[in-house]
Amino acid sequence: MTRYAGWIIVASGLLAQAGCATHGPAEQARYQVSQTCNGALHCYATIQAALDATEGAPEGGWILVQVGPGHYIEKVTLKRSRVRLRGAGVDRTFLQFDIPAQDAARYHRDHWGTPGSATLTIDADQVIVEGLTIENTFDFLSNDALPDDDPRKIVNSQAVALLLDKHSDRVLVRDAALLGYQDTLFADGKRGLVRHSTIAGNVDFIFGGGQLLVVDSTIRSRPRTAAFKANEVQSIVAAPSTLLAQRIGIVVYRSRLTREQGVPDGSVALARPWHPTRNFPDGRYADPNAVGQALYIDCFMDAHILPDHWTSMAGTARDGSKTALFTPQDSRFFESGSRGPGAHHADIGIKWTDAPSIAEVTRVILDDWPEASIGGLP
């Protein structure tokens, strides 16, 4: 048994909090979001207005933004540290916005549509998001059904629900739902923790180069409407772009990989390696140092999981063409303790064996993470 920063890692790898029964930090300021404020003090009609108002609160303490029941149709950016964004429950409070990457470049500092499409962007340290559904409501399925040569087809159909942006760290999402199709959760910052939540999507719907731990959650694959050949990979759960210098990437622990109606058996890969296209002194091409890491530990897998479990991903070659192919065999992919109809898998020659244990993962993810910002784990 190991102790650190108020936490205990027991032999099984479970996390337990030492001497603390609280479920969140004490707040020094509170703001309310409601569709019926009726002139109440510190009550706002939109989530963004409430977050903007928090800028006037003194620095240092935690701030609670309590969001009432309802559908809030807005793009939200959270930049203040030590904010607790709390809804009335995943079936009562909904933060939603409808935009794909193709139309969202104007919302991003580098004019990149994928992060620009995010319904909720978090770019702060020590943030708790709980008790609400966050969704990008772009109609992916209607677009997916269009032929590639249809002029109405949106090519860049990524539509992010939650972006953990570059300056984010120690972000906890719990008792929440993240809904989308392609690119639902973009982990592009430092450390994130998702617990007792649902993440739903189909193409690369948990992705990025950040350190992300998903615990005791449901990873729900959603259907495609495009035409596929028999036994063709239709969807991918994770697309990590973890830098080689980073020990931890995307880790799914003690969670359930389920599917919605219409997702065929053997059609969904656990992960594929994303090598983002970046600028280098000798050109612009797929980053060779982004050797993605994805770990699945003690997870239930339904029959929709691909028999090979992992698949390849194309990237930008040095000549600018999309001919570079990155394979699972050259990535940092690993699983242990899998169970369920989709747990059995073929041997495709995965050679990477230096996978961290769940105890190491939790030490890295929770290092210097004040226990007040996490609550009771587990």
Regions found by a protein language model. Give the residues of each.
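Sequence-level preference for short, compositionally simple segments enriched
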Residues: P25-P378
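Positively charged n-region of N-terminal signal peptides that target proteins for export
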Residues: M1-Y4
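Bacterial N-terminal signal peptides
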Residues: G6-Q17
